[in-house]
């Protein structure tokens, strides 16, 4: 598989970039189907890669501020910035670096792991779109960039859509992440096992109910019952059931800081501002925040 765009990957993870530069990116999907992706340029920073037409940010949300600073040398007056990341509020940070009519935002519905340099393991959705994104503010430049990205993703084998209004799709991903990311990290279970347990499923329902209330108040109507029906389908259909989501990897495997502040923490903040009680999200945010601040003090069996 080769790319059909002039694409530069910039990452300070030197071993990862070196491996991709030498051999391409080994991309494993569907439990073992392997593709060797080639044709990339690589760099450890954006300092010397020139001005880009489009800059895509796919970092952890707690790394976005630093990534924006690092990307400054490749951002010109007509560069379109794109966030394809988990969490709420990423587009607001991009708008501070470029005008709203030059910012796209969205997210994917596929889980990923990076087990070693140059290798990515992904769990795509069983069917349908893998990536959804839209413009913060429509303009000829933003719409042209969105249409081109849609074409490139689709031609590359990643079904995606550039939406007039991406918010329903973004909220769907955010609520799914608010549900399974922290619960998997706290309970040490995969999504399928959380939903098989009466207590785990009960926790999921409470988180979803609060998130849907907040989403509705923010102008994106969602009902918890309909969302839970779709969530159960995704867990039972092989999309997210059999891997540990990123927050579980952060907490259980790598002892890293998580994205809790832009997931459940953001739901809690929105809830307070809107007068909507969010006790489950409040408690989950406190638990994960406590865990990630005290890795060095935790019991080691």
Question: Where are the regions a protein language model picked out?
Answer:
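Aromatic pocket-lining residues of Rossmann-like dinucleotide-binding sites
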Residues: 1-2, 177
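Conserved N-terminal Rossmann-fold NAD(P) cofactor-binding segment
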Residues: 6-52
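Rossmann-like NAD(P)(H) cofactor-binding subdomain of soluble oxidoreductases
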Residues: 34-121
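Rossmann-fold dinucleotide-binding core
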Residues: 50, 86-169, 173
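Helix-loop-beta segment of a Rossmann-like dinucleotide-binding subdomain
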Residues: 75-78, 120-134, 185-195, 244-252
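NAD(P)-dependent Rossmann-like dehydrogenase/reductase catalytic/cofactor-binding core
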Residues: 154, 201-301
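Active-site-proximal catalytic alpha-helix in oxidoreductases
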Residues: 167-195, 199-212, 239
């Amino acid at each position: 598989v080769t790319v059909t765009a002039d694409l530069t990957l910039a990452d300070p993870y030197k071993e990862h970039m070196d491996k991709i530069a030498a051999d391409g990116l080994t991309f494993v999907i569907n439990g073992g189907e392997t593709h060797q992706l080639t044709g990339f340029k690589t760099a450890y920073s954006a300092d010397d890669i020139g001005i880009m037409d489009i800059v895509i940010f796919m970092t952890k949300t707690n790394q976005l501020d630093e990534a924006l600073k690092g990307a400054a040398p490749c951002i010109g007056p007509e560069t379109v910035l794109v966030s394809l990341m988990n969490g709420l509020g990423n587009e607001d940070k991009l708008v501070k670096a470029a005008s709203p009519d030059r910012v796209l935002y969205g997210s994917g519905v596929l889980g990923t792991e990076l087990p070693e340099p140059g290798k990515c393991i992904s769990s795509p959705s069983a069917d349908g779109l893998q990536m959804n994104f839209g413009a913060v503010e429509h303009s000829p430049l933003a719409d042209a960039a969105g249409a081109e990205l849609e074409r490139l993703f689709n031609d590359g084998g990643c079904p995606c859509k550039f939406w007039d209004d991406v918010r329903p799709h973004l909220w769907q991903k955010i609520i799914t992440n608010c549900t399974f990311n922290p619960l998997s990290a706290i309970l040490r279970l995969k999504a399928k096992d959380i939903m098989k347990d009466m207590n785990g499923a009960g926790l999921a329902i409470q988180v979803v109910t609060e998130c849907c209330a907040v989403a509705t108040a923010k102008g994106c109507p969602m009902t918890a019952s309909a969302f839970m029906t779709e969530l159960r389908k995704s867990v039972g259909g092989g999309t997210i059931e059999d891997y540990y989501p990123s927050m579980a990897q952060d907490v259980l495997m790598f002892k890293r800081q998580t994205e809790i502040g832009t997931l459940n923490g953001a739901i809690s903040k929105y809830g307070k501002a809107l007068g909507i009680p969010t006790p489950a999200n409040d408690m989950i945010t406190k638990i994960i925040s406590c865990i990630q601040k005290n890795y060095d003090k935790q019991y080691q069996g």
